[in-house]
Structures are given as structure tokens and as C-alpha cells.
Amino acid sequence: MNQEVKSGKVLSPSTPWTQRPVPGIEVADEQQTLKATFTEPTIECPECHALVTRTAISFNAYVCPQCDEHLRMKARDRLNWFFDNVVAELGQEFSAKDPLKFVDSKPYPDRMREAQTKTGETEALIAMQGNLNGVDMIACAFEFDFMGGSMGTVVGDRFVKAAELAIEKRQPLICFAASGGARMQEGMLSLMQMARTSAAIQKLKDAGLPYIVVLTHPVYGGVTASLAMLGDIHIAEPKAMIGFAGKRVIEQTVRETLEEPFQRAEYLLDHGVVDQIVHRHALRDTVSRLVSKLMNLP
């Protein structure tokens, strides 16, 4: 039987012409190509199901290059992306306590350790001082993967410290909100953070300093009922879910079916709840421009 040897492969006469190499043209081995493609970890877009490498999605600010879906962004990645230069991280001295000795299916300290291992963070809020387009500012971001971005005493401590430093330095405060609400494991102490953060925001406003909130997916509960809805300007990312109680809870309470876009950023924009929806790629310039106008900067 006649056989051909091309590029290290043994080809029989029965090999289809589509699989035969063309003289002068080198074709990469299919298995090697697939192996090279998947040597780097990939992320599947929840909207179009495209596989995108972590490097590519990170470079694109966690926006799917195929369908433009805004994927969830980790708090530290978001702040490092937002600032041109980070000066300092705030509130690292605060650590969670367990005064209620709370236990559900497991003790609260065990849940905290699991969240810290999962995210690499010590709490659900990260606050930083930095600059954007030449303007110094303070920004904080919720880490949703840390117990659903829930607000406990340390989240309140860090937010208040960020607001106080903003007043001291005469700088604007930006908050990227993403939370399921107050942290039930801390009971009334977590609910008190709604009042604490609201009071800190009022002091910021009394000082004549801007407070801009960026509502990312999702924002619910006590965070919505306090610091997330007290901004001078509310920006939402596309398709973000924003509300107090979730859609399912509301439907079970009122015994009615709610329309599909309910609580979506676009629906809330149409009803005057948020001021604008901004694509993530335009967010830095939008915030920079708003801060310059609100602070009468050149």
C-alpha cells in the first residue's frame, strides 16, 4: 500500500483531500492548536457562552469581547483598574468580631475563614486612596464573593474611615456597590452600619464634597437602603440588578408576577431611580468628568 509521509504524519490513499497538507503551506496540528488554546485558564461568558482567556477578559475590564456582557469584577481588580495610581489602602486594621457567637449551619468565624480563603480578602469592602486623570480621590468597592458583599461592622468601619479621610483631604468619595445587604450573622450590629454610613455621607455632603455611587450587579437589601442610594449622582452598569427585596420575594408577598425588566438598571433609568447607565469602558472618564464639574476643577 502506497503511503505518503508529510509533516511527520503517515497518510494513506484514503486520507480525505481536505486533510492533506498543501506544499509550501504549514498547517498547525489540530490537537496542538487546541492544547495551546486551553493552556491558559478560560472564563465562560454567562450570556453568549463564549470561552475567553483570563488574560483577555482582564485586559478588557471583564467585559465579554464577543457580546459586551459586563461580568462581575473583583473589588481589588476594580479599584486597581479604576485608579491611575493607588496611594494607600484604608482600614486594614479593622477585623471582624463575633460578639453574638452566631451559629447557623456553622459558626460565624468558620464562615469568615472560608470567605477569606475563597477571595484572598479580609472583608467584603476594600477602600483605597488614589488618583484618576490627575485628580486625587477616595474609592471603595464591595467584594461580592465575600459572603455576598454583606455589610457588617468592618464594612461600616472601612466606609466611615474612607468618608472621614475624604473630608480631611477635601477629596471626592466614589463607591462601587455590589451587595446582598446587611450581614445577618452580626444581627443588629450590621443594621447599625446603615445609620453609620448614612451619617458619614451626610458629613461628606455638609463639607461640600461629591459622593458618586456606581451600582454594579447586584445591589440589594440594607446596602441599597443606605449608602448605595445616597449619592449625589448614581451611575449604573448595564443590566445590573438593583433593588431592596429580590423579585421572587416581592412576587410571593404581593402574589403578582412582575414584568421581566423589573429591577434592571435600564428599567430603573426609565423610572428615574438612577441618573445614567455607563459602559464600563467609559466609566473612568465619566467619573473623572463628573468630579471635575462638581468640584469646579479645570
UniProtKB/Swiss-Prot annotation:
Cofactors named for this entry: Zn(2+)
The UniProt entry's GO CC annotations, sorted and at most eight, read:
acetate CoA-transferase complex
The cross-references to InterPro entries, in alphabetical order and at most eight, read: AcCoA_carboxyl_beta (IPR034733), Acetyl_CoA_COase_Trfase_b_su (IPR000438), ClpP/crotonase-like_dom_sf (IPR029045), COA_CT_N (IPR011762)
Ranges for domain CoA carboxyltransferase N-terminal: 41-298
Subunit relationships: Acetyl-CoA carboxylase is a heterohexamer composed of biotin carboxyl carrier protein (AccB), biotin carboxylase (AccC) and two subunits each of ACCase subunit alpha (AccA) and ACCase subunit beta (AccD).
**Cytoplasm among keywords:** yes
- Free-text remark on how the cofactor is bound: Binds 1 zinc ion per subunit.
Residues in C4-type zinc fingers run 45-67
Q: What is its EC number?
A: 2.1.3.15
Pathway where this protein functions: Lipid metabolism; malonyl-CoA biosynthesis; malonyl-CoA from acetyl-CoA: step 1/1
**What is the name of this protein?**
Acetyl-coenzyme A carboxylase carboxyl transferase subunit beta
Top-level taxonomic group: Bacteria
Q: Does the keyword Transferase apply?
A: yes
GO biological process terms held by the UniProt record: fatty acid biosynthetic process; malonyl-CoA biosynthetic process
Q: Which reaction does it catalyse?
A: N(6)-carboxybiotinyl-L-lysyl-[protein] + acetyl-CoA = N(6)-biotinyl-L-lysyl-[protein] + malonyl-CoA
Mind listing the UniProt keywords for this protein, alphabetically? ATP-binding, Cytoplasm, Fatty acid biosynthesis, Fatty acid metabolism, Lipid biosynthesis, Lipid metabolism, Metal-binding, Nucleotide-binding, Transferase, Zinc, Zinc-finger
Q: What does this gene product do?
A: Component of the acetyl coenzyme A carboxylase (ACC) complex. Biotin carboxylase (BC) catalyzes the carboxylation of biotin on its carrier protein (BCCP) and then the CO(2) group is transferred by the transcarboxylase to acetyl-CoA to form malonyl-CoA.
Where does the record place it? Cytoplasm
GO MF term list: acetyl-CoA carboxylase activity; ATP binding; carboxyl- or carbamoyltransferase activity; zinc ion binding
Report the sequence similarity comment from the record: Belongs to the AccD/PCCB family.
Residues that hold Zn(2+) according to the record: C45, C48, C64, C67
Q: What class of enzyme is it?
A: transferase
Q: Where is this region: Disordered?
A: 1-21
